[in-house]
Amino acid sequence: MHQFTIAELVKGLRNKDFSSTEITQHYLDRIARLDNTYNSYITVTGDVALQQAAAADKRLAAGNTSALCGVPIAHKDIFCTAGVRTSCASKMLDKFIAPYNATIVENYLKAGVVMLGKTNMDEFAMGSSNETSWYGPVKNPWNTHCVPGGSSGGSAAAVAAHLAPAATASDTGGSIRQPAALCGLTGIKPTYGRVSRWGMIAFASSLDQAGILSRTAEDAALLLNDMASYDPKDSTCIERDVPDYTADLNKPLNGLRIGVPKEYFGEGLNPKTAALVEAAIKVYESLGASIHSVSLPHTHLAVPAYYVIAPAECSANLSRFDGVRYGHRCEDPKDLMDLYMRSRSEGFGAEVKRRILVGTYALSAGYYDAYYSKAQKVRRLIKQDFVDAFHHVDVILGPTSPSPAFEFGSKGKDPVAMYLEDIYTIATNLAGLPGLSIPCGLVDDKPVGLQLIGNFFAEAQLLNAAHQFQQATDFHQQTAPGIE
């Protein structure tokens, strides 16, 4: 049963081949038996899941349901879930019980989707390896000596190990697409503003976006149908009709113009990864797409600009965790300043502290113009590069990550080396564009991701391009060795 995709689960539930309760119990049993190996979940909501599954079965019996009714998924532990711990993988929020649901959680609840639990992640979504979690690192099901990517590593590992058929995730600089690449999954980050951020604990508010990790593009389309919505509670959410993302999945790719940026194939890209991406380009040519060389000349500035803007926003957002209102509070503070200092020192991990310090420095008097203001100007130039490119092409294609999954500890002592893992994904966030990663082969028995970037609100086109690639290949059907 755990081999089924979301689309197959939907069909089976409609045909009464199995019940939501049976599927949910099956996944809960697998999590209990296998997740000690992967550490993909922080909280398993067994009782809640079975209650939701029973309610979904009643709705299914009545026949008046949404497409996803009865399907179980996992939620990244960055999304607030009423009555359930929402920790952001931090000691700071270890005991925080959210009083309300994030909008996307509420959307899925209304659709009858079952919550299996909350998945592990890098602390406050800051990381590319899922090594910064207060609850311990997550292991990649393809090779347990290697990282699953981050920050949505728990969501990726859970889906790759078949401990959930799909999971919600978030992406600030690549945190959906990079784990998708390293774990052999489909991961989509929608256009900024397409999906509500209300109830998603903020890292960098102008970059954060909720999205999906699944096995196939078809599954991602089904899940995005219910995830995307206009939400007046999120002032950055755009009031725009949500299309049926499954409607054009089978549309032929004849006439699709795919741009390949020369800047994505330079120094630092694993040659074997490059070869697989080039092979994927040939697949697209065989499907009727035309390939065009494009230039994104400010690509080399994306990482430095991001690591000024994101820490600056994180410094502001995380200032709310002060030991007064909620979150970790130190014992016996001498005065208010001691309360602030010790609560934050004890509650935040090393990487979070590093980014807060960098961000505070960039925003400080005398440095704002030299760093933050300049980074925002670079951001505008990066966005303009994409705008110019999309005058000539429909989709931009390249590698998702410069190399396959790396071993634990191999980059932890060099923050810059870790930051460069997101070199191909960050620009998409800076521009606010939709991005998607799909598997395109294996290097040294580890998955490699192919990234597709679309114009604003072109999620349907990206999903169509991804689905057609998956109809022509079987990379998305490959399972990590040893998975039961």
Swiss-Prot record:
PROSITE patterns: AMIDASES
Record field: transmembrane: none
UniProt KW keywords: ATP-binding, Ligase, Nucleotide-binding, Protein biosynthesis
Highest taxon listed in the record's lineage: Bacteria
GO molecular function: ATP binding; glutaminyl-tRNA synthase (glutamine-hydrolyzing) activity
E.C. designation(s): 6.3.5.7
Reactions catalysed according to its record: L-glutamyl-tRNA(Gln) + L-glutamine + ATP + H2O = L-glutaminyl-tRNA(Gln) + L-glutamate + ADP + phosphate + H(+)
Gene3D superfamilies: Amidase signature (AS) domain
Residue pairs linked by disulfide bridges in the UniProt entry: none
Enzyme class: ligase
GO terms under cellular component: glutamyl-tRNA(Gln) amidotransferase complex
This protein's record includes keyword Repeat: no
SUPFAM superfamilies for the chain: Amidase signature (AS) enzymes
Pfam family, one: Amidase
InterPro entries given in the database record: Amidase, Amidase_CS, Amidase_dom, AS_sf, GatA
UniProt GO BP: translation
Subunit and interaction comment: Heterotrimer of A, B and C subunits.
Function: Allows the formation of correctly charged Gln-tRNA(Gln) through the transamidation of misacylated Glu-tRNA(Gln) in organisms which lack glutaminyl-tRNA synthetase. The reaction takes place in the presence of glutamine and ATP through an activated gamma-phospho-Glu-tRNA(Gln).
Database matches in PANTHER family: GLUTAMYL-TRNA(GLN) AMIDOTRANSFERASE SUBUNIT A, TRANSAMIDASE
Family assignment from sequence similarity: Belongs to the amidase family. GatA subfamily.
NCBIfam families in the cross-refs: gatA
HAMAP family, sorted: GatA (MF_00120)
Name assigned to this protein: Glutamyl-tRNA(Gln) amidotransferase subunit A
